[in-house]
UniProtKB/Swiss-Prot annotation:
Pathway: Bacterial outer membrane biogenesis; LPS O-antigen biosynthesis. Belongs to the glycosyltransferase 6 family. The active site is at residue 185. Gene3D superfamilies: Spore Coat Polysaccharide Biosynthesis Protein SpsA, Chain A. Keywords: Glycosyltransferase, Lipopolysaccharide biosynthesis, Transferase. The keyword Endoplasmic reticulum does not apply. The gene is wbnI. Binds 1 Mn(2+) ion per subunit. GO terms for molecular function: hexosyltransferase activity. This is O-antigen biosynthesis glycosyltransferase WbnI. Substrate binds at residues 8-13, 93-95, 115-118. Signal peptide: none annotated.
Amino acid sequence: MVINIFYICTGEYKRFFDKFYLSCEDKFIPEFGKKYYVFTDSDRIYFSKYLNVEVINVEKNCWPLNTLLRFSYFLKVIDKLQTNSYTFFFNANAVIVKEIPFSTFMESDLIGVIHPGYKNRISILYPWERRKNATCYLGYLKKGIYYQGCFNGGKTASFKRLIQICNMMTMADLKKNLIAKVHDESYLNYYYYYNKPLLLSELYSWPEKYGENKDAKIIMRDKERESWYGNIKK
């Protein structure tokens, strides 16, 4: 079985890829080979040294479309993946620092990571989309988990369904000139509210800026340390 990896790196985010790739090859589900689908506006030659990387060219958009449109990117390739495989998305700044075996996911259709910034907060304080005219609206009386958008996926058939629905909702809102509060993460949280995934702890998305955590399995590198990052959201 091949494990499919979705990775978006438009613009300067390509600088993160080498370190992510090497860590993923070494520590993420090492029992199986991996195929990487890299969505980028960079030249293909930048990734040509890796034989298991397929480059999918996408247009570089301004913030927040460069993250909001991720579901439409994924639809470009999802149909050609084997339905009995597994597919996972990682943020560009992810680095796997401890081995994560296949047994972590094998019994689950989908996985979701609790957002470390909202782990101990009550639901009314979550940045769920509260506007009633948004397709991803979740009211203040709802209770649940707030998921981080940096690492998700699962069985390819289940992940495909998530992608299709979240893309449909995203496009419906864009037609109304409505941008969800936390962009793609708002749609992910809506979907997971009604389709509960296997919940992974914050150790699977530990922010580097929170300081060292010897138990962390995946580190999210501090993008703000990069000199180019200040221009991303302009």
